[in-house]
Amino acid sequence: VLKLENGENVPSLEQFLKVAKKKTRLKLILELKVYDNPEWETKSIEYILATVKKLKLQRRMEYITFSWYSVQEFIRLAPKGTSVYYLNGDIPPEKLKEAGCTGPDYHIGVFRSHPDWIDKCHELGMKVNVWTVDQPHDMKWFIEKKADFITTDDPVVLQQLMK
């Protein structure tokens, strides 16, 4: 456990997942940050996957990362069917599909610049997540485009628009 200057404790991954495991309806999304060294990314992924397996949480976990290297490592090392999304926005749907990625999890600006990517992802059988969509007109646009997941800081407005 890491103790902050203000006295708060930062839990380890295992400690956090043990608490989260009790929330049985909660889908767990883990973002792996980009490292300067690919070897560290691989070792981190191995640790993450071992911890998730130990706690029997594989079916509830999804992984997201800005690192293309980490996406490929998660796909290589995780059990088949594990959801892995790429965040960086610089890879088209066909390449994501070819790599075995579940789909893109791209910033709103990426999909606004490439609106055809949403339909293409769906044609390829992938899921689409977009972030961070806070304006009602943008929410409506992504609802109409049938984005599978919309990340927002204003969920009440999004829920109202989805009715």
Task: Write out the residue ranges for each language-model feature.
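C-terminal active-site rim and adjoining tail of enzyme catalytic domains
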Residues: 5-8, 85-163
